[in-house]
């Protein structure tokens, strides 16, 4: 589960921007809030809104770029041909309309949860080169906090459950340490837990592609259909039911029923 994402100096984003899924301490809609095993509350849905050209899509693109920065080296070393399409390189570009920020690094900070722990991952990148990287963990069962690793330009420090792991003296300065650990220690339980979230815990859908958006509605789940109908009705549209059909040519048709 995504808890919080912060980015600074990325494309149209100059100052620090945070996308937060933590629920505010209010009594309204308590039945819709997700409650963690440790009592922390999270929103089931959130939205980024603003004028056209305001940089909304760049917030999500920043998150996508961070995820791909970590996963791409793992995909490159995989023998699975089916994931080749997922190896697209996303360039991490700084805010270009300022003579200072264009030469400054891009900063990412990510909080996310798995079934076992909450993690904080920080990555600072300048022209694809890793300037700083850090990973911390909080066990959900015990609440125990621990640092797992920290990396800067001068040294790499493996801590806690990672203390006995080894790194190469020739580790590339463009390769995230998290990616390196995923390649070298793929059977380590904590490494698998972290990278499992990056690989399967978050998906990116391009709503600029109407065909991809329609495919979301193809789901055979009645629960998904009811949720979509509820969202449509909350927008004051007169659609009370819909049916989606996909023909042999992979084309999609949507039939709607109105009041």
Task: Give the role of each language-model region.
Residues 2-71:
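Pre-Walker A-like glycine/lysine-rich segment at the N-terminus of P-loop NTPase domains
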Residues 4, 18, 107-111, 120-122, ...:
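Beta-strand secondary-structure signal
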Residues 7, 11, 110-116, 137-139, ...:
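Short acidic, glycine-rich loop/turn motifs
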Residues 15, 97-99, 132, 180:
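Generic structural "secondary-structure junction" signal
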Residues 21-23, 180, 256:
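Pocket-edge structural micro-motifs
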Residues 41, 47, 61-120, 126-127:
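Conserved P-loop NTP-binding catalytic core
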Residues 44-51, 247, 251-259:
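Conserved ABC ATPase signature
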Residues 116-250:
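Electropositive, glycine-dotted interaction segments
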């Amino acid at each position: 589960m995504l808890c919080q994402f912060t980015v600074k100096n990325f494309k149209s984003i100059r100052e620090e921007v945070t996308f937060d899924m933590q629920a505010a301490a209010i009594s309204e809609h308590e039945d819709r809030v997700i409650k963690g095993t440790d009592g922390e509350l999270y929103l089931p849905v959130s939205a980024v809104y603003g004028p056209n050209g305001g940089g909304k899509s760049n917030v999500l693109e920043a998150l996508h770029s961070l995820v791909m920065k970590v996963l791409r080296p793992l995909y490159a070393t995989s023998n699975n041909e089916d994931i080749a399409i997922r190896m697209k390189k996303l360039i991490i570009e700084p805010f270009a309309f300022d003579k200072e920020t264009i030469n400054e690094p891009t900063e990412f900070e990510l909080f996310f949860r798995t079934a076992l722990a909450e993690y904080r991952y920080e990555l600072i990148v300048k022209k694809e080169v890793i300037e700083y990287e850090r990973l911390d963990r909080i066990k959900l069962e015990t609440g125990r906090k621990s640092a797992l690793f920290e990396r800067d330009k001068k040294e790499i420090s493996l801590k806690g459950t990672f203390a006995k792991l080894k790194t190469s003296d020739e580790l590339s300065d463009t390769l995230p340490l998290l990616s390196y650990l995923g390649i070298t220690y793929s059977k380590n339980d904590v490494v698998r837990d972290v990278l499992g979230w990056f690989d399967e815990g978050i998906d990116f859908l391009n709503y600029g592609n109407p065909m991809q958006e329609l495919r979301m509605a193809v789901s055979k789940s009645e629960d998904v259909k009811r949720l979509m109908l509820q969202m449509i009705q909350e927008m004051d549209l007169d659609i009370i039911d819909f049916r989606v059909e996909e023909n042999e040519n992979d084309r999609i048709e949507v039939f709607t029923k109105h009041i």
